[in-house]
């Protein structure tokens, strides 16, 4: 069983040309977060983050094909600028009033590498392989936008 869970947990690592404090703050300051969160082609329509252990977050977006999605979760660990952990689940049809789907956990570590930051994200375990791969693509696109945001605001 553990082997299945391991193949359905993403591990992504990227080096960002910014200090751990700047990268961490891009995750926890709402007006910064909305500028890069979600992959290209998705417009954030609503975002609320209450970054503290036990605090909630939710985000609603619209993709190019007109599909609305909504996700939400709870912050579990907030250790600036070292670690961030929160739960994650999608809502059916982009409606917060509808039940949440399969819940996963997002764990992020921020490590100084000179004046840069190595960010490692673990997200999962997912219910199936298509969901795992879809989130891999989503995080990859979001990280590209985060990189551009950090460059633009340096």
Each model region followed by its residue ranges:
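Well-ordered alpha/beta subsegment
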Residues: 117-121
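Hydrophobic ligand-binding cavity/cleft-lining segments
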Residues: 1-43
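Hydrophobic-ligand binding "helix-grip"
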Residues: 34, 39, 47-53, 58, ...
